[in-house]
Amino acid sequence: VETDEIIAQLDTFQARLFIRRNGQVEPADPNTLANNLLLIRGLLIQLVDKVAESESIYRKTKAARFDSFLTAHKPGEKAISKSAAMDKLDMEDDLIDMKIGSERVKNYMKYVDGLCTSIQSVLKVQSSSEKSQY
C-alpha cells in the first residue's frame, strides 16, 4: 500500500469521527468513534513504516551522492572538499523533495495522533457520564 493510499483511507475514517447535527459538528456515537479509532491507529502504524522506509532511502541516496561528489574529479585535479560536497548536496532538488515529503507525512501523522488522543478523551468522558447515570 502506498503512502497516498494510506492517507486517503485515514481521511475516510477521520470523516466518520464527526457528524453534523443542527448545523453543528460533533463527535459520532461512541461505537463509531471506537471502531474508527482502531482503524486509524492501524493505518498510523503503516505510515510509520512508510516514513521509516522513505527516510532510509533518503539517507542511502544522500550518502551515495556524497560519495560520488567526493570521488568525481579528473586525474590531476583537486578533489572537492567534504564541506563543499555537503553544500552541493543541500542544493539537490530530488533530495530536497524527498526530505520535504517525509516531513509532511510526519507532521500529518502528528496531527492525526493528536486528533485520536482528543477523540479518546471524548470517549472517556462519554463512558464515564454513561456510568454515572446508572
Go through the PLM ranges and name each one:
Residues 34-67:
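Short, well-structured hydrophobic secondary-structure segments
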Residues 1-4, 25, 134:
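Terminal, low-complexity, charged helical segments
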Residues 21, 55, 62, 69, ...:
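Coiled-coil heptad-register positions
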